[in-house]
Amino acid sequence: MPWIQLRIDTDGPNADAISDQLMEEGSLSITFEDGKDNPIYEPTLGETPLWSHTVIVALFEANFDLTPVVERLKLLPCLGDNFSHKVEQVEDKDWEREWMDNFHPIKFGDRLWICPSWREIPDPTAVNVILDPGLAFGTGTHPTTALCLEWLDGLDYSNKDVIDFGCGSGILAVAALKLGAERVTGIDIDYQAIEASKANAERNGVEDKLALYLPEDQPADLLADILVANILAGPLRELAPLIAEKVKPGGLLALSGLLQEQAEEISAFYSEWFNMDEPAHKDDWSRLTGIRK
């Protein structure tokens, strides 16, 4: 079934009032977009981010008459007679199928491949992680995940235990096991992530070496030779003492999920417990690594 959408240019403070009016007019959904395409990755603590130039996108059924809707919107004081808007036809698509069609096997480092479960494996002799990410974050396509996978590919896992702190889909945990880790512990605040990690471990035949916990259930004495945390700068900052105490002396650390401009601050924060390396970058994102003192 096709749709039509009404796109309205406005400023941030008026977006909610216009959105309410559109819902009363029969809109099926409302989406806010940044009119200047400036992404907000992680707001400052206590800050509510607002775009100064907001595009409101209202979706309607294809046969909906938008002419009277536009006329009534002109009566809103925050819009007026000459407000900027556009009506567009929207093709009906199977978005899940389209996403699957565009997710291909990806190589990381010298030996590691991430392969979606519905694709053929390009190199059967490589280390292949078969992934079905479900609803949890982590497919390898995001720069932070890629940075972590490239780091994991270059490690020696002989008799090593690993912690995946914020395991999401389990992509990093499963990759470490397929690369030779003795045992991996995955921790996440989201039960759905725990289930996705479990399913992906079973798909790769490594479920017997993977322990998964919500934070409140993890063992108090949990320690690892290698810890990777692909979360965000805020949690990395707040949880630094907890993360540090889980790494054995001489153990390895990798942190990602942070922007380039956040890397220096987070690196300095962790230098209390780790000898930190120079950051690695991909696009706007960074990865920090270090060795436990």
Curated annotation (Swiss-Prot):
GO terms for biological process: methylation. GO terms for molecular function: protein-lysine N-methyltransferase activity. It is an enzyme of class 2 (transferase). It catalyses: L-lysyl-[protein] + 3 S-adenosyl-L-methionine = N(6),N(6),N(6)-trimethyl-L-lysyl-[protein] + 3 S-adenosyl-L-homocysteine + 3 H(+). S-adenosyl-L-methionine binds at residues 145, 166, 188, 230. Signal peptide: none annotated. It comes from the Bacteria. InterPro entries: Ribosomal_L11_MeTrfase_PrmA (IPR050078), Ribosomal_PrmA_MeTrfase (IPR004498), SAM-dependent_MTases_sf (IPR029063). Gene3D superfamilies: Vaccinia Virus protein VP39. Its EC number is 2.1.1.-. One of its GO terms (cellular component) is cytosol. It is found in: Cytoplasm. Keywords: Cytoplasm, Methyltransferase, S-adenosyl-L-methionine, Transferase. Transmembrane segments: none annotated. Its main location: cytoplasm. It holds the Pfam family PrmA. Methylates ribosomal protein L11. Belongs to the methyltransferase superfamily. PrmA family. This is Ribosomal protein L11 methyltransferase. It comes from Shewanella pealeana (strain ATCC 700345 / ANG-SQ1).
